[in-house]
Amino acid sequence: MKRLNKLVLGISFLFLVISITAGCGMGKEAEIKKSFEKTMSMYPIKNLEDLYDKEGYRDDQFDKNDKGTWIVNSQMAIQNKGEPMKSKGMVLYMNRNTRTTNGYYYVNVIKGEDKGKHQDNEKRYPVKMVDNKIILTKEIKDENIKIEIENFKFFVQYGNFKDLENYKDGDISYNPEVPSYSAKYQLTNDDYNVKQLRKRYDIPTNKAPKLLLKGTGNLKGSSVGYKDIEFTFVEKKEENIYFSDGLIFKPSEDK
């Protein structure tokens, strides 16, 4: 009888530990979603200039008269098996103080031996934004690059995360020492955002991607660190296909 009672107590304790662990994981998942929701709830922003009138999270890193700067970044990276990784994307710095936007379009080819090293082969093409249009600030000869820049759209302009709460049972990671955190969800090819990416990019795989929300800094809010959204289609040795997006709010450099 005593052995039976000990066995019952042992099993009960085990279930209690599992429940507490699961509860903590679910709580952290909710925290991560809430942290990203502050900016993801703004998607889509078809007219990027609307960001001049939107304020992000402010902390003591901001001067009181600084309205802040939005940094917008979207990139598509494709590495077919055994080939160099090719990535193209754009970064914009939207200064709310001056209501001006500058940045660059970039093209990079990373060979296997280059990984982990400083890249000198990245080509940047400086741009500015006027009336929600991206304009080259220097004349270039490459007509294909010109067309790519003219037609470029950031993910924040067409992405939609209204169903974020419906993403369940994510693979959650949290390191309070850094701090860093991430939540990963398996998507389907019927997902709205996946369809939008396939519509705009020639993605050489039929595999449905995983959505990765990853960041560093205080989960409750911080101008220090970063937050990235990534759609990972393929992640293997010498074969990678992913799309990354970022929308972060930082103190202005001209403050």
UniProtKB/Swiss-Prot annotation:
<keyword id="KW-0449">Lipoprotein</keyword>
<dbReference type="GO" id="GO:0005886">
    <property type="term" value="C:plasma membrane"/>
</dbReference>
<protein>
    <recommendedName>
        <fullName>Uncharacterized lipoprotein SA0095</fullName>
    </recommendedName>
</protein>
<keyword id="KW-0732">Signal</keyword>
<feature type="lipid moiety-binding region" description="N-palmitoyl cysteine">
    <location>
        <position position="24"/>
    </location>
</feature>
<feature type="signal peptide">
    <location>
        <begin position="1"/>
        <end position="23"/>
    </location>
</feature>
<comment type="similarity">
    <text>Belongs to the staphylococcal tandem lipoprotein family.</text>
</comment>
<dbReference type="InterPro" id="IPR038641">
    <property type="entry name" value="Csa_sf"/>
</dbReference>
<keyword id="KW-1003">Cell membrane</keyword>
<dbReference type="Pfam" id="PF04507">
    <property type="entry name" value="DUF576"/>
</dbReference>
<dbReference type="InterPro" id="IPR007595">
    <property type="entry name" value="Csa"/>
</dbReference>
<feature type="lipid moiety-binding region" description="S-diacylglycerol cysteine">
    <location>
        <position position="24"/>
    </location>
</feature>
<keyword id="KW-0564">Palmitate</keyword>
<keyword id="KW-0472">Membrane</keyword>
